[in-house]
Amino acid sequence: MSNRQYFKAEALKHRHTVLRKLLILMPVICVALAAFLTHVFFAVDGYNWWYMGMYPGFVALVCGTICEKEKKMKNRAILALPCDMGRVWDAKVLYGILMSGAAMLLLVLLVLAVAFILEHVLNVTFIIRPSLFSQLEAGVLLWLSFCWQIPWCLLLSQMLGRTVMLLVHFVLYDVMAIFCPYLFFICYFRGRSEPE
């Protein structure tokens, strides 16, 4: 079997799950909240809310749902198949990356469309107005910077279960978001105080 067939099997397995609903629902909720709550900072806040809260949750839920299918049967169905387990894992990771990329693309398109409506139809003046290129670039960079979390969350979900993985993922993400600026601050002064 080729890698394409493994990927098709993974996509077919998740065809009637909650993933496609989440793929549409989470970006729509994020854009709607940003549009209603912060009119003049809409484009910036749409991305900020997405990468600080909604996108990590989306990635964790996608990975938990991907692993949940086999975990229900204790991996007996997939272990009995005459297939390469490495390719099965690669197909899961690739499917998770594709789902996260589709969600990011939908968010970028929604932010662009709603920003156009707010600016040209409702005459809202944005305080910060990112260009089209910078918004597309932000979407690509956000997607690429989150791709490493998909194998990590799949591994945690496989080992610990979906609920524990969600808790560990959110706690680690929030702790790193809080302490990361201070770590750079400490490293900056430590490097500057050394004699030359």
Language-model-detected regions and their locations in the chain:
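Helix-capping/transition residues at the boundaries of transmembrane alpha-helices
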Residues: K13, I78-A80, S157
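Residue-level recognition of membrane-helix boundary sites in multi-pass small-molecule transporters
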Residues: V18, L22, R87, V164-M165
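Secretory targeting signals
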Residues: P27-T65, L94-R162
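Amphipathic cytosolic juxtamembrane alpha-helices at the membrane-cytosol interface
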Residues: C83-Y95
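Aromatic- and glycine-rich beta-strand/loop motifs that create alpha-glucan
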Residues: M1-I24
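Residue-level recognition of transmembrane alpha-helices
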Residues: I24-P27, K92-V93, H169-F170
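Transmembrane helix boundary and interhelical loop/hinge segments in multi-pass membrane proteins
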Residues: V44-G46, C63-L81
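Terminal transmembrane helical anchor/hairpin motif
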Residues: T38-Y47, I127, F133, L166-E196
